[in-house]
Amino acid sequence: MLKGAIAQRYAQALFELAVQENLDGIEAELQELVQCVEQNAEVAHVLYHPHISLSEKKDLMNKIFAGELSVTVRNFLNLLIDRRRQNYLMEIARVFAHLADEARNIVEAKVASAIPLSETQEQRLHQELARMTGKNVRMVKEVRPELIGGVMIQIGDRVMDGTVAFKLQRIRQSLSHA
């Protein structure tokens, strides 16, 4: 089975449970868990090392996160370990966050520009994206000087490229085919 499909199934199961219990709390704990694993090499070593037994992994993870994570998230982590799916944790967390955003009617827009946008430009862009999508928009901004000017926006798999660099590329292509 593909990694994405496995992560989707586990994320969906946890999401359905979280909706019944406490979506915001479980999402925050899952992100905290991922952050801890990413930032702490010892925790990552224990979680991912193939020669540490499953029971040792579960015991150590339960001790490390006893006061930090709810029983629901600790049980979910134990399930991943039991089924040898802990390597999917990061992807599961990413899919879970996407499901939570969908439930809250939030869409993420990645906005790249050559220079930082002014507050007025950000507000106008935010309003226009909300109007276009019919959803609440969370903008993730990135400054990329190589774009020369303009803005590139990505929402899901849709890209709107209004950058000077893109327009120059199109001019080059049309001149080379002329």
From Swiss-Prot:
Keyword Transport attributed: yes
Gene3D superfamilies (alphabetical): N-terminal domain of the delta subunit of the F1F0-ATP synthase
Entry annotated with the keyword Membrane: yes
Major place of residence: membrane
Top-level taxon of the source organism: Bacteria
A Pfam match: OSCP
InterPro entries linked: ATP_synth_OSCP/delta_N_sf (IPR026015), ATPase_OSCP/dsu (IPR000711)
SUPFAM superfamilies: N-terminal domain of the delta subunit of the F1F0-ATP synthase
Entry GO terms, CC: plasma membrane; proton-transporting ATP synthase complex
Membrane topology: Peripheral membrane protein
Compartments it resides in: Cell membrane
Keywords per UniProt: ATP synthesis, Cell membrane, CF(1), Hydrogen ion transport, Ion transport, Membrane, Transport
GO MF term (any one): proton-transporting ATP synthase activity, rotational mechanism
Oligomeric form and interacting partners: F-type ATPases have 2 components, F(1) - the catalytic core - and F(0) - the membrane proton channel. F(1) has five subunits: alpha(3), beta(3), gamma(1), delta(1), epsilon(1). F(0) has three main subunits: a(1), b(2) and c(10-14). The alpha and beta chains form an alternating ring which encloses part of the gamma chain. F(1) is attached to F(0) by a central stalk formed by the gamma and epsilon chains, while a peripheral stalk is formed by the delta and b chains.
Function: F(1)F(0) ATP synthase produces ATP from ADP in the presence of a proton or sodium gradient. F-type ATPases consist of two structural domains, F(1) containing the extramembraneous catalytic core and F(0) containing the membrane proton channel, linked together by a central stalk and a peripheral stalk. During catalysis, ATP synthesis in the catalytic domain of F(1) is coupled via a rotary mechanism of the central stalk subunits to proton translocation.
Similarity field: Belongs to the ATPase delta chain family.
Record's protein name: ATP synthase subunit delta
Naturally occurring in which organism (per UniProt): Desulfitobacterium hafniense (strain Y51)
Gene name per UniProt: atpH
